[in-house]
């Protein structure tokens, strides 16, 4: 390759990196940041065009097999796809020295369609029809590919624009999947754009048509779908009941509204991309109606979506479990992810937590029965203000669960939070208002034993919402064994409890696999005995309340009691002391887990990046 000019004369502040072939020059200008990658502006010296240079830290990707799978899936798909309405792929390579994975794609001068639409709030109906046709052509290409490809996260954030000639292309295929079977199984996407059948874990490429309809709604109204909802649980409730977004009522053009409705009908009635391209609404361009003139040009704070929009990704038992527990003790940008699973003869609950920043955790709860029916709900947990009980109560209300499930779900959330965020002080709804209640002389419900708090002499840790003693010199395996013994409320004969498994560094292990000689089922919080569990209604019946777990009202335990009434004014110091002990013991446990994690990471690096 013959290049004219001197690279040394390029401003160092602008040119920061050159690819191994010296064809692409990366500038320091950041175009965007995603969940895994940073996108920079770059220049192709051969073609003389500007391109997009996506860069991912290998260490960050290697901590999560899920992230690695997504990255290589996107690269593989982009390499094989060639269509005028699908993002172009140019090249990719791994930089062993800088430990980065680099991908070169085409550059879109106007950013995403959402950004473009926000920048230009007044557009003619003809323009929206033009965008819609291009997106449908891209979807038709993906869906008729052999095998078919489902995007699964189609939204205006993932549709890109070259505004100088109105070109629109589908991009961000990191969550796309190849349809090797007639029906897909995993739940993944952005809640506001997810079709109802996605939550049921049984869907095909028509889920992209539903998402396309939501994209059309955003193009017309400049609003995110379901912006009237404050959380994902409310969105799930409306979607599962077939309630359309409130923004749909703001569309005054009857033909446009009818066209969007065709995309949002049940999957059995939904048209394909090819069929929608033949719709009379798109076949006619003789309209000069301006749209978007009376709608807000910014998204509500509660549903503001950045390039790092959350993705729901919960796989069924039929697929490989890819969630991991990864931690960044150096305070870097890596996200921590942890997953717990509780199973029973009737029900399986899977709670996945991802630490987004210092103050928020993204949680995904999956509730499934033996028949394969499942419900999935995604919600945010704010560490400085939310409590497990308040979030659980909201989930129970939105999902129409039984009231007795609030405590169980709250215990489940507390268990995950205290493991995901070392040192996090668990907030209690009652403790948050101690000052006002102490003045009134009211008592608080705290977790303790029948023994008086002042007589507690052992170290204690919080597991499943209960305090358990731990010998100071116990090893991690002894510690876990003591937890298993302590939480086996029903004794050796209680086989129908709740078991718990932890995903660590890509390998699914139960607690028994970490050095415990004898594994016993973990009971669920205060629930005890073989009669405590029972699914009263099938999960597929979304209109009626159902109980995840039933509490055995007659069951008691001689050592552990939930809800013992203790005065805050008398025992606040004791409570604070116990919380300090909890934090100290979990720190010790996490140090051991960190060591295990580092060993696993090193093994992964040696596997994927062998020394040359």
UniProtKB/Swiss-Prot annotation:
The active site is at residue 172. Residues 25-282 form the Protein kinase domain. One of its GO terms (biological process) is intracellular signal transduction. It is an enzyme of class 2 (transferase). It catalyses: L-seryl-[protein] + ATP = O-phospho-L-seryl-[protein] + ADP + H(+); L-threonyl-[protein] + ATP = O-phospho-L-threonyl-[protein] + ADP + H(+). ATP binds at residues 105-108, 155. One of its GO terms (cellular component) is cytoplasm. Belongs to the protein kinase superfamily. Ser/Thr protein kinase family. WNK subfamily. This is Probable serine/threonine-protein kinase WNK4. It comes from Oryza sativa subsp. japonica (Rice). The gene is WNK4.
């Amino acid at each position: 390759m013959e290049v004219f000019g001197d690279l040394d004369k390029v401003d160092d502040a602008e040119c920061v990196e050159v690819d191994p072939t010296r064809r692409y020059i990366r500038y320091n200008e950041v175009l965007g940041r995603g969940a895994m990658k940073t996108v920079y502006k770059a220049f192709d010296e051969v073609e003389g065009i500007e391109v997009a240079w996506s860069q991912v830290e290998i260490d960050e990707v290697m901590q999560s097999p899920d992230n690695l799978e997504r990255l290589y899936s996107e690269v593989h798909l982009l390499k094989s796809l060639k269509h005028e309405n699908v993002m172009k792929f140019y090249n990719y390579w791994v930089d062993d020295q800088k430990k980065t994975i680099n991908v070169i794609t085409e550059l879109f001068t106007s950013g995403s369609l959402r950004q473009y639409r926000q920048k230009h709030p007044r557009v003619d109906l003809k323009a929206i029809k033009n965008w819609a046709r291009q997106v449908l052509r891209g979807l038709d290409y993906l869906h008729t590919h052999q095998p078919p490809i489902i995007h699964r996260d189609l939204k205006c954030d993932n549709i890109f624009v070259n505004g100088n000639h109105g070109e629109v292309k589908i991009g961000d295929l990191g969550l796309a999947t190849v349809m090797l079977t007639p029906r897909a199984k995993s739940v993944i996407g952005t809640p506001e754009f997810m079709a109802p059948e996605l939550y049921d874990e049984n869907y095909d490429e028509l889920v992209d048509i539903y998402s396309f309809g939501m994209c059309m709604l955003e193009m017309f109204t400049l609003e995110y779908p379901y912006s009237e909802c404050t959380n994902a649980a409310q969105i799930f409730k409306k979607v599962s009941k077939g309630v359309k977004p409130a923004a749909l009522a703001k569309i005054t053009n009857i033909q446009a509204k009818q066209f969007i409705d065709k995309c949002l009908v049940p999957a059995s009635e939904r048209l394909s991309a090819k069929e929608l391209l033949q719709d009379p609404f798109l076949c006619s361009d003789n309209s000069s109606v301006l749209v978007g003139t009376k709608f807000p040009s910014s998204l509500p704070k509660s549903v503001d979506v950045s390039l790092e929009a959350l993705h729901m990704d919960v796989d069924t038992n039929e697929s490989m479990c890819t969630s991991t527990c990864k931690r960044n003790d150096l305070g870097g940008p890596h996200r921590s992810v942890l997953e717990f699973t509780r199973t029973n003869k009737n029900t399986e609950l899977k709670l996945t937590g991802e630490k987004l920043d210092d103050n928020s955790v993204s949680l995904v709860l999956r509730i499934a029965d033996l028949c394969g029916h499942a419900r999935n709900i995604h919600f945010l947990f704010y560490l400085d203000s939310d409590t497990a009980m308040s979030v659980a109560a909201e989930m129970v209300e939105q999902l129409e669960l039984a009231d007795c499930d609030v405590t169980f779900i709250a215990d489940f959330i507390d268990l995950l939070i205290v493991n995901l965020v070392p040192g996090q002080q668990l907030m209690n709804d009652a403790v948050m208002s101690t000052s006002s209640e102490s003045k009134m002389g009211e008592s608080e419900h705290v977790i303790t034993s029948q023994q008086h708090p002042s007589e507690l002499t052992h170290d204690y840790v919080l597991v499943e919402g209960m305090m358990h003693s731990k010998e100071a010199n116990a090893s991690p395996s002894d510690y876990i064994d003591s937890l298993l013994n302590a939480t086996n409320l029903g004794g050796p004969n209680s086989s129908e409890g709740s078991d718990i498994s932890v995903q660590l560094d890509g390998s699914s292990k139960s607690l028994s696999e970490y050095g415990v000689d004898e594994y016993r089922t973990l009971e669920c919080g205060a629930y005890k005995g073989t009669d405590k569990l029972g699914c009263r209604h099938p999960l597929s019946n979304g209109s009626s309340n159902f109980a995840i777990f039933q509490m055995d009202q007659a069951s008691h335990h001689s050592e552990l009691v939930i809800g013992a009434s203790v005065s805050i004014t008398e025992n606040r110091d004791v409570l604070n002391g116990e919380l300090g002990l909890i934090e100290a013991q979990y720190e010790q446990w996490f140090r051991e887990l960190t060591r295990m994690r580092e060993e696993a990471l090193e093994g992964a690096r040696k596997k994927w990046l062998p020394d040359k």
